[in-house]
């Protein structure tokens, strides 16, 4: 490592332009912008082939509390909260303590209704159905005053034969949603009068079944008894909507996905694509197509397989007994690889359903990637791990939770932006947590395109479930079958998991091993399925001694395995905090509103944050903003400790998925990116500690030794040069050296032992910093700075920062020079949101670093300089000010 080094960020200008281009997509996040409520299109009739559809979505709906007057306009898809917010009937649930003021919404029934016009050509079809892609949750549907159905599952796709209930011309649809919020009271007192509400009747029926089974043993004093009073055990609705330790309860209802009338002669129900890979040569696809053919006509399925828009194979097959199966050979197959390991080509399989007159009755397109994925169990000291196309690799990424506690506020553009962020930070895997709602196809599509593998969890979390009830189990079977059929073609899905952290209970095996596992293996042969994520002995590790037990970060050094959940909390960015507080709330980090937005550890999460700040950074700062920034630095430091330990110990550890990538409401949580999509220090740090090539230290303080490891996740061996320096806190070099390294593909190995005992004896352990820089082909690929003591014991002088600003195509280029060590240096525009090419970096004395900054609004150079703040950890940590 040379002094006066100009450091180039690893975020290229092209990547930076792509990142900033997506900023506008995020403005729909509530409270983060002035985005308005946009009405949707009105319904209209469309013909595709011989299928006729009438979209019932749009802004022609009205919604009213049952038994009340004064309805408001409703948008479909949508939900009751967005409709009431648009009408000004409720306050912003995210602001201050407003969430307490909107709880009544989930405790009362709501009625959605509209009229619509049916054209003769729709009713002329042999079959006409109402297709509801998502009803949240306990619904009763009437058309023209006639009862159609009473669905009770938020996650299912509902189809009802309604031809006999329709007429040409004006028709009327009414959907009533019974409240889900009041089931908690019913569960706690199952003998109370339910008032005849279907929701309450459901809970009482299930409770009675368990009362008969367990008798007097089922009491409110037992864990199982308490859990049975929780509505998330009974109702097939996203569990987090009743509140979690990172969000409050927001019990939604409404038509949250598309709704339409479909008229058809025959239609395709499902297309499943199964692969058979030979050692060399072509890949054989077996395309299984299921159709609905009410007229029992002679039908033919025509198949066209395309890559990059060009046809690579065609075939056709006669449909027999509403099914057909055809093998199609793909010559010169292009394999799909995870992010960082290769390309992610996607093959499109188009299926046209034709009658004997060659008329296309229906058409479906499905995409897939050609790959062989294996999940190997723990064995002979090796952790559970993934292998793709014969290559074992380390899984890097995070856990995904819903992007908003009001789902209709989340757009495909927002989801894609999050997935792009993950790919830019070298993630190759995400875990879709089991307590939310099933992620939409647009999110899986983005993962397919970006090479992000997925651990798919069915939506069961942290509760026992009423497996004794036959109707409840039938409901779940239909839900699971739908999810497997919808998602099995996605190459991104690596692991199917039955639940998140559901403790063993009477019926566990029946639900998670036999029922869900059986359906996965039936519909997706060869897929890897585990009954639950984080289950003891599974090899899928959730570790919470750090944070949960307040253990120090060094506790991570005792953990091995396929780690899919671990985390430390921090506050969101000050700008985000300002969206949910007023000025008086920000006079103290411990104010009532600041505590209201912290839901972890039974409301003691702020105390946990302060515990870790004290442990590593000494007495926290007095002002709120400094405490916020310092909490983010602390979080990044802790998670980096765990990730680098597991990467250094590759084979004994083969995954590091951080809890959690994102937020669904604003407040202090474990997230890497806050609710307003502002990157925390941890997200910036992840791009460095998840880099394909990593240089990482292992300190043995008592021995006066630092072992340097090089981790190479790439598919090729690398050769490079390492420069290292030991400096004082004032930037004086006391020792340095260089050496060459060779790192085989997909390995971790110790490359050097650096001894600092003599320097420590002369200067003191708390007066030294170790720096190292790894270059491959002359380019910096990884660097590090490590201290030999906790940060609070480093008494740093002022770094002597200077900077220049110039306008550039992507915004502004900022060049920062430092005379002395500048630790955890970051840029921030005080009153303006912006995207930054990097942040929270360590600047070696005498170095110059270049940032690219893209503000949300247009600024002159003078305005930009007025907003710009350049800070280091020394500015926000009193104990480190030497």
Describe the predicted segments one by one:
Residues 4, 8-430, 648-649, 653, ...:
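Secreted/periplasmic carbohydrate-active enzymes, especially glycoside hydrolases
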Residues 56, 63-66, 238-240, 247-254, ...:
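Substrate-binding clefts and catalytic carboxylate motifs of secreted carbohydrate-active enzymes
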Residues 108, 414, 472, 508, ...:
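Conserved acidic
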Residues 160, 242, 337, 466, ...:
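Active-site oxyanion-binding pockets that recognize sulfate/phosphate
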Residues 417, 478, 482, 518, ...:
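Charged/polar, solvent-exposed surface patches and flexible loops
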Residues 429-602, 634, 638, 643-645, ...:
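Substrate-binding/catalytic cleft of secreted carbohydrate-active enzymes
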């Amino acid at each position: 490592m040379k002094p006066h080094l100009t450091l180039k960020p690893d975020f290229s200008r092209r990547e930076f332009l792509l990142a900033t281009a997506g900023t506008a997509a995020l403005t729909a996040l509530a409270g983060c912008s002035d985005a308005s409520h946009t009405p949707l299109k009105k319904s209209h009739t469309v013909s595709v082939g011989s299928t006729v559809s009438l979209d019932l979505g749009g802004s022609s709906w009205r919604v009213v509390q049952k038994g009340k007057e004064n309805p408001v306009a409703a948008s479909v898809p949508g939900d009751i909260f967005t409709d009431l917010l648009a009408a000004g009937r409720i306050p912003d649930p995210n602001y201050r303590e407003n969430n307490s003021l909107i709880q009544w919404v989930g405790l009362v029934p709501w009625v959605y209704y509209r009229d619509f016009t049916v054209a003769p050509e729709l009713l002329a079809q042999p079959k006409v159905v109402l297709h509801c892609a998502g009803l949240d949750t306990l619904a009763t549907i009437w058309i023209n005053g006639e009862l159609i159905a009473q669905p009770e599952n938020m996650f299912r796709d509902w189809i009802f034969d309604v031809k006999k209930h329709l007429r040409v011309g004006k028709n009327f649809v009414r959907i009533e949603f019974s409240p889900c919020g009041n089931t908690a009271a019913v569960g706690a007192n199952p003998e109370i009068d339910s008032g005849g509400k279907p929701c309450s009747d459901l809970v009482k029926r299930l409770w009675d079944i368990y009362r008969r089974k367990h008798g007097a043993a089922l009491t409110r004093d037992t864990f199982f008894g308490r859990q049975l009073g929780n509505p998330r055990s009974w109702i097939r609705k996203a569990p987090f909507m009743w509140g979690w330790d990172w969000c409050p309860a927001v019990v939604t209802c409404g038509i949250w996905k598309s709704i339409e009338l479909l008229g058809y002669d025959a239609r395709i129900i499902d297309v499943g694509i199964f692969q058979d890979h030979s050692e060399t040569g072509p890949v054989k696809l077996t395309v299984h197509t299921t159709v609905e053919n009410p007229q029992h006509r002679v039908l033919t399925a025509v198949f066209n397989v395309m890559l990059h828009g060009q046809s690579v194979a065609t075939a056709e097959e006669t449909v027999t007994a509403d099914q057909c199966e055809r093998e199609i050979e793909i010559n010169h197959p292009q394999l799909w690889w995870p992010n960082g390991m290769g390309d992610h080509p996607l093959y499109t399989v188009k299926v046209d359903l034709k009658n004997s007159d060659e008329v296309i009755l229906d058409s479906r397109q499905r995409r897939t990637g050609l790959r062989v994925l294996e999940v190997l169990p723990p064995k002979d000291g090796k952790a559970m791990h993934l292998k793709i196309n014969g290559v074992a690799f380390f899984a890097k990424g995070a856990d995904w939770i819903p992007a908003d506690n009001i789902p209709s506020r989340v757009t495909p553009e927002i989801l894609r932006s999050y997935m792009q962020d993950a790919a830019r930070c070298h993630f190759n895997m995400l875990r879709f947590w089991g307590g939310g709602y099933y992620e939409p196809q647009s999110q899986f599509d983005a993962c397919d395109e970006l090479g992000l593998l997925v651990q798919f969890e069915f939506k069961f979390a942290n509760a026992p479930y009423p497996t004794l009830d036959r109707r409840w189990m039938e409901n779940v079977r239909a839900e699971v079958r739908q999810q497997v059929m919808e998602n099995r073609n996605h190459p991104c899905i690596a692991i199917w998991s039955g639940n998140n952290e559901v403790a063993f209970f009477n019926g566990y095996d029946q639900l998670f091993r036999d029922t869900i596992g059986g359906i996965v293996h039936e519909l997706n042969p060869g897929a890897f399925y585990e009954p639950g994520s984080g289950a003891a002995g599974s090899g899928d590790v959730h570790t919470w001694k750090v944070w949960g037990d307040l253990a120090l970060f060094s506790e991570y050094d005792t953990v091995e395995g396929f780690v899919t959940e671990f985390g430390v909390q921090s506050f969101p960015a000050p700008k985000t905090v300002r969206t949910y507080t007023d000025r008086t709330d920000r006079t103290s980090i411990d104010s009532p509103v600041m505590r209201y937005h912290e839901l972890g550890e039974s409301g003691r999460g702020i105390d946990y944050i302060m515990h870790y700040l004290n442990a590593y950074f000494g007495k926290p700062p007095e002002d709120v903003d400094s405490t916020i920034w310092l909490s983010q630095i602390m979080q990044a430091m802790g998670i980096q400790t765990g990730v680098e330990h597991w990467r250094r110990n590759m084979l004994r550890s083969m995954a590091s998925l951080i809890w959690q990538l994102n937020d669904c409401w604003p407040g202090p949580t474990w997230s890497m990116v806050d609710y307003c999509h502002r990157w925390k220090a941890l997200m910036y740090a992840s791009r460095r500690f998840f880099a394909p090539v990593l240089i990482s230290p292992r300190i043995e303080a008592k021995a006066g030794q630092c072992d340097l490891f090089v981790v190479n996740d790439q598919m090729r061996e690398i050769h490079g040069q390492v420069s290292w320096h030991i400096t004082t806190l004032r930037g004086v070099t006391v020792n340095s050296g260089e050496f060459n390294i060779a790192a085989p593909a997909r390995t971790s190995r110790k490359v050097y032992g650096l001894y600092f005992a003599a320097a420590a004896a002369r200067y003191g352990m708390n007066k030294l910093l170790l720096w190292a820089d790894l270059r491959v082909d002359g380019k910096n690929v990884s660097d590090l700075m490590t201290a030999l003591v906790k940060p609070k014991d480093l008494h740093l002088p002022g770094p002597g920062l200077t900077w220049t600003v110039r306008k550039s195509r992507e915004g502004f280029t900022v060049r920062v020079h430092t005379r002395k060590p500048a630790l955890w240096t970051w840029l921030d525009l005080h009153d303006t949101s912006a995207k930054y090419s990097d942040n929270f970096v360590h600047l070696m004395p005498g170095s110059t670093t270049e940032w690219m900054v893209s503000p949300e609004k247009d600024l002159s150079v003078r305005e930009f300089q007025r907003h710009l703040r350049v800070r280091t950890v020394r500015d926000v940590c009193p104990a480190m000010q030497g």
